[in-house]
Amino acid sequence: MLKRILLLLTMLAVTATASAFSLTDSKGKVHTLDSYKGKWVLVNFWATWCPPCLDEIPALIALHDKYKNSRLEVIGIAMEYQNPKQVLDFADSMFISYPIVLGNSKIAAQFGPLQGLPTTYLFDPAGKMVAYQVGGITQQAVESYINSKSTVKK
């Protein structure tokens, strides 16, 4: 019972904290949840040394490229790196088209405890955190989830 209560409190803290995030990407652009009202927002924590993180990058690129001008924003937060240039060079080599934030513990704290990498947070168009996943994601899973929630509200 105590574990359930602690888990619930952690999830509530994540929701309350993450709703106010402010992230500056590698190009100097500031991303806030409020600036994306009306759109789904996917925030993905990853690292260059993390195989599951690398496996999901093509899906994140595909999601960003398909929906960036319509209903979904993708933001990547690189964690556990020693050299920012290494991360940015890696992102270029992978043709990552979505914004990359050079993360740290202060940035991660805006979302609550980071359980592992990769971790993905999904916010609905109203700005509410509606899902998060520790571990890899797929394009199909994200699209299915968004479509299921979008059809419910119609």
Placement of each model-derived feature along the sequence:
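Positively charged n-region of N-terminal signal peptides that target proteins for export
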Residues: 1-4
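N-terminal "domain-start" segment that seeds a small globular fold
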Residues: 10-34
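Short loop/turn microsegments at loop-to-beta-strand junctions
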Residues: 19, 41, 117-118
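Short active-site neighborhood of thiol/selenol oxidoreductases, capturing the structured segment around
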Residues: 34-51
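Structural signature of beta-strand start/N-cap positions in the alpha/beta core
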Residues: 39-41, 73, 99
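Conserved hydrophobic packing residues within short motifs/helices of P-loop NTPase cores
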Residues: 41-43, 75-77, 121
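Structural microenvironment flanking redox-active thiols in thiol-disulfide oxidoreductases
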Residues: 54-94, 105-108
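Thiol/disulfide oxidoreductase modules built on the thioredoxin-like
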Residues: 89-96, 102-147
